[in-house]
Amino acid sequence: MNLKNTIKEDIQDALIKIAIINCDPVITLNKKTKIGHYQLNNLIKIANISNLKPFELANRIILNIKKKYMYKEITFSQPGFINFLINPYWISEQLEKIFLSPRLGINHVNAQNIVIDYSSPNIAKEMHIGHLRSTIIGDVMARILDFLGHNVIRANHIGDWGTQFGMLIAYLEVKKLVNSPLSLMKLEEYYCKAKKKYDIDQLFAEKSREYVVKLQNGDQYCYSIWKKLVSITMLENCKIYKRLHVTLKKKHTMGESIYNKMLPNIIEDLKNKKIAIEKNGSTIVFLKEFKNRLGEPMGVVIQKKDKGFLYSTTDIACLKYRYQVLHADRIIYYTDSRQHQHLLQAWTIAKKALYISQNLLLEHHIFGMMLSKDKRPFKTRDGDTIKLSALLDEATERAMRLIKNKQPNLSKKKLNQLSNIIGVGAVKYADLSKNRNTNYIFDWNEMLSFEGNTAPYIQYAYTRIVSILKKSNMPIKKLKEKIFLTKESEINLAIKILEFEEIILLISQKGTPHILCKYLYHLATSFSHFYENCSILFPKKIKTCKSRLKLSILTAKTLKKGLNMLGIRVVKKM
């Protein structure tokens, strides 16, 4: 049930009846719930367009919609607001529908093919904290769009091609390590050594470039080593994905190498279409849409003098593939803000070449950095980048210490399971609860707190409801009486439950999980107020008990579903 949309449509219908069209009513939650649960916020702006005083316009709108069953009362307040008090009986009817719905009353939308490009680590390197935001924010979007009925194509655009593989293969050859046991940790160590050698040893650099050419030309020996490197890396990455409880699997890997065979044809085609030209041995596209420091059209190199391809070339091919082969209607990229201009340039070239439709929805959902308390990039004490596995290990250990203090007699198996769910959930929620467009301060104490907008607080709210339901000893099938709402805290909780669909639809458009986190926190606090003000298990009447149990069940279902969309698990006991 999308309450905001319903109110908005009612207002638009009322405006049309008084010959006011093309207006966009802005509906917000009202902080003063006693006079209205929702509020029309831009009445003055609409009144100015219609040459009416706000009070006159408000009266006309109210006259047209006040008889609708949904509203208990509609009032005007100065200087220019309309307040909508929702009818508790109408709210109860909506809750009954949701109670019987496995999807909490949320319908499927018209399906689109949506590619979500996220995580995208590099081969031969361990995942680090820089990969966390892309991985978990992208995964929330994938889960939500899946739930709404879209055909979601998860694309893990791994860096599995390029000069670094020539370096690594050459190093493994020189050091006679090709047939030795290799781990991802060792591969990263060898890559660092290979890079240093490449920068100072001309013969080694030449050999590395030869291996790159061989690999690009399909040399079987180089290809077998490359495949081994990819396999070792992805095996470890998939372990991280499993620990993070994200939906990325090995089958979602769509690395840069997929597009390698397309690149020569794309260069030729862009030349033939006069989009690209050769200059000083390189192939360049000059884009008037982008200016260099001198105010001239910016040049985007798509092939180097040595005939090597660049990231821009790969991204153009990738776009063509996603549109023409995967039939994407919408493509969402989760990379940091530094990639923004690069992506815009690739999109512009792909459109000029008619590789993609002008109507294809292309979105770059940028995100900020994770910072330490001194507002610097979050690193180890030695200044190294923190590995994601180490971060999750510490989260689990810290959660374990907290749980041991609260439940010292817990079995080792239960302790490990609970520590993992709470620790990893806390890290994810701390990140997801911040606006992705901004940097945020990483704080262990804050994220593992059982107070405030944290995962443990919301997980605990869920377990508390489970405990209440268990104490009631009332099977769900016996809860046949209708929900009825009399107290303010009941009504406020009910309206918060109805708000869930609106939140999910908003995130599906904007890709901002912090809105869902904020909603779940407010839902949990609304339940807390309800619990404090209304006896659930021991009211005067049994029908009141059953009604409040149903309201509690709906809250628990919504909390669980919301956390699931964030990729965070619930527990029945904390």
From Swiss-Prot:
<comment type="subunit">
    <text>Monomer.</text>
</comment>
<dbReference type="Pfam" id="PF05746">
    <property type="entry name" value="DALR_1"/>
</dbReference>
<dbReference type="InterPro" id="IPR001412">
    <property type="entry name" value="aa-tRNA-synth_I_CS"/>
</dbReference>
<dbReference type="InterPro" id="IPR008909">
    <property type="entry name" value="DALR_anticod-bd"/>
</dbReference>
<dbReference type="Pfam" id="PF00750">
    <property type="entry name" value="tRNA-synt_1d"/>
</dbReference>
<dbReference type="InterPro" id="IPR036695">
    <property type="entry name" value="Arg-tRNA-synth_N_sf"/>
</dbReference>
<comment type="similarity">
    <text>Belongs to the class-I aminoacyl-tRNA synthetase family.</text>
</comment>
<keyword id="KW-0030">Aminoacyl-tRNA synthetase</keyword>
<protein>
    <recommendedName>
        <fullName>Arginine--tRNA ligase</fullName>
        <ecNumber>6.1.1.19</ecNumber>
    </recommendedName>
</protein>
<dbReference type="InterPro" id="IPR001278">
    <property type="entry name" value="Arg-tRNA-ligase"/>
</dbReference>
<feature type="short sequence motif" description="'HIGH' region">
    <location>
        <begin position="121"/>
        <end position="131"/>
    </location>
</feature>
<dbReference type="InterPro" id="IPR009080">
    <property type="entry name" value="tRNAsynth_Ia_anticodon-bd"/>
</dbReference>
<dbReference type="Pfam" id="PF03485">
    <property type="entry name" value="Arg_tRNA_synt_N"/>
</dbReference>
<dbReference type="InterPro" id="IPR014729">
    <property type="entry name" value="Rossmann-like_a/b/a_fold"/>
</dbReference>
<keyword id="KW-0648">Protein biosynthesis</keyword>
<dbReference type="GO" id="GO:0006420">
    <property type="term" value="P:arginyl-tRNA aminoacylation"/>
</dbReference>
<keyword id="KW-0436">Ligase</keyword>
<dbReference type="GO" id="GO:0004814">
    <property type="term" value="F:arginine-tRNA ligase activity"/>
</dbReference>
<dbReference type="GO" id="GO:0005524">
    <property type="term" value="F:ATP binding"/>
</dbReference>
<keyword id="KW-0067">ATP-binding</keyword>
<dbReference type="GO" id="GO:0005737">
    <property type="term" value="C:cytoplasm"/>
</dbReference>
<dbReference type="InterPro" id="IPR005148">
    <property type="entry name" value="Arg-tRNA-synth_N"/>
</dbReference>
<keyword id="KW-0963">Cytoplasm</keyword>
<keyword id="KW-0547">Nucleotide-binding</keyword>
<dbReference type="InterPro" id="IPR035684">
    <property type="entry name" value="ArgRS_core"/>
</dbReference>
